[in-house]
């Protein structure tokens, strides 16, 4: 099933208004603090490291370009055309194949798999802010892209992140400047409980190969100058 038009328009609006400079978006932390840490956890579980890598929900492509420095073929896919405009402008070397794709739409993931074959998947912070009806189709789409040989690294805000975010949103001074646009566009982060994620994985015919906890680093800082980090959970997935 396709995502709702409201959800799609929320992300188009967000990325149309987002600044282009690095680190201007709340979750756009430098790869050394994000994809670099994730890759160290992911690579030991890649059964076929030579497969193409697809970054689902790539946004402006910061992490995707990092992956492209390390793997021979990398695709960045996103629901938002405006996000992909940012990503292509930042990819001066043309390292990444950026495409608009709804990963929860079965026909689109099947078409991509038919073209590319089995893939390794990287997805950071997408499921937790999806609308409820879109969550299972997203995991089903990942299963399609993985095929038999692929592995997925999925990192999502844990349920423990919600009170942290709500505390930031309700502070007397208002939410931090980089977090405010997320709420302003009607995007609701940290909406999925941990047990539900495991259920979506199982229903998609996937198995959890490895799992752990790691703070999701943001580009925003608290009033005391410390960087805001959100509790998150990572999973390595494979066909069951």
Question: What feature does the model see in each segment?
Answer:
Residues 125:
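Oxyanion-hole/transition-state-stabilizing segment in secreted/luminal serine hydrolases
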Residues 144-146:
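Conserved helix-to-beta-strand junction in the class I
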Residues 122:
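A conserved beta-strand element that flanks and buttresses the S-adenosyl-L-methionine
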Residues 116-119:
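A glycine-rich helix->loop->beta "capping" turn
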Residues 1-114, 132-137, 141, 150-240:
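Class I (Rossmann-like) S-adenosyl-L-methionine-dependent methyltransferase catalytic domain
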Residues 128-130:
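A short His-aromatic
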């Amino acid at each position: 099933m396709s995502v709702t038009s409201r959800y799609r328009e929320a992300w188009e609006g967000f990325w149309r208004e987002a600044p282009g400079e690095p680190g201007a978006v709340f979750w756009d932390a430098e790869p050394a603090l994000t994809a670099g840490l994730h890759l160290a956890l992911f690579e030991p579980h890649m059964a076929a490291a030579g497969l193409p890598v697809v970054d689902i929900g790539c946004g402006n492509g910061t992490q995707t370009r990092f992956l492209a420095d390390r793997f021979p073929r990398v695709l960045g896919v996103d629901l938002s055309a405006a996000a992909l405009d940012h990503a292509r402008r930042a990819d001066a070397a043309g390292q990444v194949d950026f495409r608009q794709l709804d990963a929860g739409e079965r026909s689109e993931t099947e078409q991509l798999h038919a073209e590319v074959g089995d893939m390794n998947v990287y997805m950071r912070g997408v499921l937790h802010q999806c609308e409820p009806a879109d969550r299972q189709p997203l995991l089903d789409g990942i299963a399609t892209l993985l095929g038999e040989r692929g592995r997925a690294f999925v990192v999502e805000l844990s349920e423990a992140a919600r009170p942290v975010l709500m505390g930031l949103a309700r502070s007397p001074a208002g939410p931090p400047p980089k977090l405010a646009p997320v709420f302003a566009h009607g995007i609701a982060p940290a909406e999925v409980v941990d047990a539900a994620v495991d259920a979506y994985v199982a229903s998609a015919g996937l198995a959890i190969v490895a799992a752990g906890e790691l703070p999701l680093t943001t580009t925003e800082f608290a009033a005391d100058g410390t960087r805001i980090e959100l509790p998150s959970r990572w999973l390595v997935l494979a066909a069951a």
